Amino acid sequence: MSQRNRTLQETTTIHTPAEVLRAAIDFFARQTGIYAAFPEQESTTHVTLRGQGGEEVVIAAIPGAGETRVTGSTYLFDQQVARFFATLAPVPLAVATEAGE
C-alpha cells in the first residue's frame, strides 16, 4: 500500500456521524502506549486527536443517504485508523447498491 493510501483512508458505516466521532474518541483513548491519542478539536463532523510526539489523527464523518462516509487522515497511525474502521458496522450491501443506482 502506498504512503498516500495509508495517510488517507475512507469507509462507510450505518452509524451516525455523532456515533462515529464518539467511537473514535473512545477507541484512540483505549490504545496503549505510543498509540493513544486524545481529542484536541471537535465539531459535529470531525475530531482531531493528538498522540505521542504530537502525531495528529483526523476523523471526519459526513452523513449521506442511509450511510455515513468516514475518512481518517494521519501520517503514522495508519494501522490504528484501519483498526478503528474495522470496528464500525458496515452499510448493508442492499443499501449500498440502491444508493449507487
Segment roles from a protein language model:
Residues 1-37:
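Terminal, regulation- and interaction-focused segments at domain boundaries
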Residues 2-3, 39-41, 51, 62:
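A generic structural signal for short, solvent-exposed coil/turn residues
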Residues 7, 45, 55-57:
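Residue-level marker for the onset of beta-strands and adjacent loop->beta junctions
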Residues 7-9, 47, 70:
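Hydrophobic residues positioned within well-ordered beta-strands of beta-sheet architectures
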Residues 27-30, 46-53:
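Short, solvent-exposed secondary-structure boundary motifs
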Residues 33, 39, 93-97:
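Short glycine-aromatic motifs
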Residues 34-48:
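Short Gly/Thr-rich strand-loop-strand
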Residues 49-101:
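Beta-strand/loop substructures that line and gate deep hydrophobic ligand-binding cavities in soluble
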